[in-house]
């Protein structure tokens, strides 16, 4: 389940207000033509089922999403990811591949103050690893090859399929 996200901003005095120039989003989707690593997801700003209190969405994204502990454990959560990045794509793809669905609850709205920069150091090699791990575990071969090729062209030293394959084998075996 995914809540509707309301974009908020915080000014220099710490006052929080709704961001007026950000359109309402309805979950997220995976663009197939993108200059970033795969899997990458973008906000979906098109409502497919106006008037409905909920609708299926390709990917969860934003301030709040939830599952029962039992289902999370069954899916093995975010096991295998080594750092922040690709969390929503990973869990969403696992849900769909397992036969579940990602559902947006339009009446549940959570405000989220988005920051311009992360307060922690971004580790691009770990983000690349996460993307390649997800590709190797959850994509069909044709998309897996495309994902690895894109990662290699962007960063040959971090796109080592052998490392992801070792990690994939360990996760798949458990």
Which residues does each predicted region cover?
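Donor nucleotide-sugar recognition loop
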Residues: 59, 69, 73-104, 108-110
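A recurrent flexible, glycine/aromatic-enriched loop bordering the glycosyltransferase active site
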Residues: 41-66, 125
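Conserved donor NDP-sugar-binding/catalytic core segment of glycosyltransferases
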Residues: 1-34
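Terminal low-complexity segments of carbohydrate-biosynthetic enzymes
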Residues: 14, 61-62, 123-174
């Amino acid at each position: 389940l995914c809540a509707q996200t309301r974009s908020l901003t915080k000014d220099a005095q710490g006052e929080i207000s709704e961001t007026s120039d950000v359109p309402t989003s309805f979950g997220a989707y995976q663009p197939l033509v993108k200059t970033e690593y795969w899997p990458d997801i973008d906000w979906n700003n098109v409502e497919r089922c106006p008037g409905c209190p909920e609708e299926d969405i390709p990917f969860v994204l934003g301030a709040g999403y939830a599952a029962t502990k039992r289902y999370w454990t069954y899916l093995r959560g975010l096991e295998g990811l080594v750092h922040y990045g690709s969390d929503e794509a990973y869990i969403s793809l696992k849900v769909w591949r397992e036969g579940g669905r990602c559902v947006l609850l339009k009446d549940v709205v959570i405000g989220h103050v988005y920051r311009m920069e992360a307060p922690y150091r971004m580790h691009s090699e770990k983000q690349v690893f996460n993307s390649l791990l997800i590709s190797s575990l959850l994509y069909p071969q044709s998309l897996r090859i495309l994902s690895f090729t894109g990662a290699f062209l962007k960063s040959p030293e971090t796109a080592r399929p052998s490392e992801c394959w070792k990690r994939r084998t360990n996760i798949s075996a458990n």
